[in-house]
Amino acid sequence: MKVIVVGMGVQGVKRKKYLGNDFVCSVDKYKKADYSSIVDVPLKSYNSVLLCVPDNEKIDIIQYCIKNKKNLLVEKPLFIKSNKILINLEKKAKKNKVILYTAYNH
């Protein structure tokens, strides 16, 4: 598995620490990271994403990952104003055979 960590706050730093050789790079537009945007990371370099960003940034990144067939572990909460959006994301993930999982781990 080749994993990128998006969001280098407390959870992103913790998750990076445990990835070992599976870690590819970090992405964060506010903090020191390898890239400031996920779109700059070469798609062939990874197959999974650990998403540890604020809620207002999650949907766009999730959609990008699903479109590009990248598996996702989303740090909770995954708060969205409309269940329709969640249902649509789930359908797209299934269609693209992408694992989309929300978790809470400390």
Predicted regions and their residues:
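N-terminal Rossmann-like dinucleotide-binding module
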Residues: 1-33
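Alpha-helix boundary recognition
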Residues: 17-20, 42, 94
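Local beta-strand N-terminus motif with an aromatic residue
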Residues: 23, 46-49
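Residues at the C-termini of beta-strands that transition into short coil/loop
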Residues: 27-30, 39, 104
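Short acidic low-complexity segments
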Residues: 33-46
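Beta-strand-loop-alpha-helix segment that lines the small-molecule cofactor/substrate pocket
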Residues: 48, 59-104
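Substrate-binding/gating loop at the entrance of the active-site cleft, primarily
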Residues: 54-55
